[in-house]
Amino acid sequence: DRSETQEKAHPVMQLLSAAGYFALARFDDPKAVLARPQPKLPYLTAAWHYARGEVFAKQGDLTGLKAEIAALEAMKIPPQGADESKAPDQMVAIVRLVLTGRLAMSEGRWVDAQTAFRSAAEIEETEDFMQFSDPPAFWYPVRRDYAAALLAAGDKAGAKRELEATLKLRPKDPVATAMLAGLAS
């Protein structure tokens, strides 16, 4: 709750605090997520839009999902100094691309979903982002969504390849493991 009223925080601290919004999107009551006030800090605002977008995607509310994507695209975050971590800005790009992929999947646009998820995974897997924190700064390996988009388009071999790549980076990811087992059966 403090993150919603705080007016100053280093971008890296905001990125770490964003995990709270990721958890809310996954586990909290959708009405509670949508009722949360917009934070004042820019990177937390991006995480807030992401959480709301995930709720809208789960509810099939494509209008709401599109509004959250548009809000992320319109965000103007002051550039970091040259010595600063790129991870906070990368997080904003990841959440925007993940929601873009969710929208494309909801609309049956498999190639667009693949493009969005692949781009998000590539950012998530950069050295700057991967080395930023342990556990990883983003809550799940986006490459598994890329695999899901490939599978939705009928590309089982591509999905298998991407799930195996996911498990090289996060060997115990339960969703990627289950998806890979499902392909084998």
Listing of model-derived features with the role each one plays in the protein:
Residues D1-A9, A35-L44, L72-D89, A121-S133, ...:
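Solenoid-like repeat scaffolds
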